[in-house]
């Protein structure tokens, strides 16, 4: 809160709310002395005592820890007050033992929930066996993961994947894809004329120089300009502009089938078909960035698997859920693309390490389960039922629902950041994207009861922001990149 009440004023009230949930008995005296606190402070104390997870006070253990660490950290993020230290399933706890229901999954990372028992077991076992040996040598798990990704992609209706490059993150996966597209273009046109790369407004492909050059937001590109030359930017879902955008000079086109950071914008089938057709006409590589929307978040292993074969890409990039919190990424390519890559063209020191690959092998095996994918679609339907009710309650605020599966966006007519604050102080973590959009990317294992619980909290938070008197400050920084305003 903007004017946080010091913890010593509310500690007595908060102690009454024990972790067991058993209320303490209070006996009123025959005559209660009137409070000597100013009315504003008294109201603030009463309000804070009524919240399930009020943000830590300025004199709290949390604040002291943050203040001691902040001077040593490069200020790349704006963070809200809680400090998280423990997670289980769809819940996460801060260092003062406040529990939060997590609708963010670490930005679509923890698809199997926090501290999944199988993931934890593999981390323990493999860390005692072999963690890293470099890509100068073979290990049992890099090839096993690559084979599994290829086989599950084909079984799940995805593109003609043939080979895999394993790395450490989504940005690295996209950097590899960009390099592979450039190499493909050089193979077709050795004079280097086929070098241009195309991406789209509203996209987010990463923060390294290549992936940032593919992310056309002037606010974030300008401090690091000039960008890598050869990038062109088009309008998402604009079929009419494709032919002028993608030309004989184009070596590659990179697109998110569902834009995550951009606002949960879904590419139309017609647009993706036209894009594939044009890439084939000019001999350009089509790259689908499925880092956020892939690995069964849409109800299929890959979002593009819902498309006709004629719309499928040549390269797919993935990360996030691939490691369920462990840093790992991958770039999947067709045999045609792979045939242009030779020894020494690309590499990584840590990528493909046996620890990460063994983890990812377990995770992909489980996320590719058809029953899990069916459940994702059932859970989407449950979320949408709640969205209908919330729209009926706030018809002037809720404008649209976008997305597929468990990557959903609720478009608001007003700034959503106060809702983020109000939800967090009531026990729910949710994030934003695009412009005035609430983003829902919970663990894929979330239960119906947890969905219901979270949506009840969200409605309460929206009621506090849009109907009750008083100011709730916004929580900024709850998305990777905020659109220019």
Predicted features, each with a name:
Residues 31-485:
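Conserved N-terminal phosphate-binding loop of PLP-dependent enzymes in the Aspartate aminotransferase
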């Amino acid at each position: 809160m903007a004017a946080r009440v010091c913890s010593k004023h509310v500690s007595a009230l908060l102690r009454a709310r024990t972790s067991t949930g058993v209320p303490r008995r209070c006996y009123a005296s025959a005559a209660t002395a009137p409070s000597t606190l100013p009315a504003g402070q008294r109201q603030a104390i009463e309000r804070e005592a009524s919240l399930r997870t009020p943000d830590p006070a300025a004199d709290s253990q949390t604040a002291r820890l943050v203040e001691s660490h902040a001077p040593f950290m490069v200020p790349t993020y704006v963070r809200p007050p809680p400090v998280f230290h423990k997670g289980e399933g769809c819940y996460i706890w801060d260092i003062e033992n406040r529990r939060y229901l997590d609708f963010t999954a670490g930005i679509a990372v923890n698809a199997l929930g926090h501290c999944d028992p199988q993931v934890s077991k593999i981390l323990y076992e493999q860390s005692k066996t072999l963690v890293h040996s470099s890509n100068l040598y073979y290990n049992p798990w890099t090839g096993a993961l690559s084979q599994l990704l290829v086989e599950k992609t084909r079984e799940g209706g995805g593109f003609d994947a043939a080979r895999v490059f394993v790395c450490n993150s989504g940005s690295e996966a996209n950097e590899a894809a960009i390099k592979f597209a450039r190499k493909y273009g050089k193979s077709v046109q050795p004079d280097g004329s086929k070098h241009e790369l195309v991406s789209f407004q509203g996209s987010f492909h990463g923060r390294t120089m290549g992936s940032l050059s593919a992310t056309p937001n002037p606010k974030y590109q300008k401090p690091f300009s000039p960008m890598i030359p050869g990038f062109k930017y088009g309008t998402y879902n604009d079929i009419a502009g494709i032919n002028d955008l993608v030309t004989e000079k184009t070596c590659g086109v990179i697109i998110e089938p569902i834009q995550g950071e951009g606002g949960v914008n879904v590419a139309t089938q017609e647009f993706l078909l036209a894009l594939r057709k044009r890439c084939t006409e000019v001999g350009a590589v089509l790259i689908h960035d499925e880092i956020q929307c892939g690995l069964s978040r849409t109800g299929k292993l890959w979002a593009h698997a819902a498309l006709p074969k004629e719309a499928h890409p040549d390269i797919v990039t993935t990360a996030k859920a691939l490691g369920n919190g462990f840093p790992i990424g991958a770039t999947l390519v067709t045999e045609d693309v792979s045939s242009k890559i030779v020894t020494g063209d690309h590499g990584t020191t840590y990528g493909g390490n046996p620890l990460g690959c063994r983890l990812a092998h377990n995770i992909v095996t489980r996320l590719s389960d058809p029953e899990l994918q069916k459940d994702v679609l059932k859970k989407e339907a449950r979320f949408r039922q709640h969205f209908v009710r919330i729209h009926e309650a706030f018809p002037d605020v809720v404008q649209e629902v976008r997305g597929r599966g468990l990557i959903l966006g609720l478009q608001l007519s007003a700034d959503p950041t106060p809702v983020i604050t109000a939800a967090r102080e009531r026990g729910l973590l949710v994030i934003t994207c695009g412009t005035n959009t609430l983003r829902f990317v919970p663990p894929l294992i979330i239960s119906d009861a947890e969905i219901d619980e979270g949506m009840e909290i969200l409605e309460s938070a929206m009621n506090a922001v849009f109907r009750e008197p008083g100011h709730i400050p916004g929580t900024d920084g709850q998305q990777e990149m905020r659109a220019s305003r």
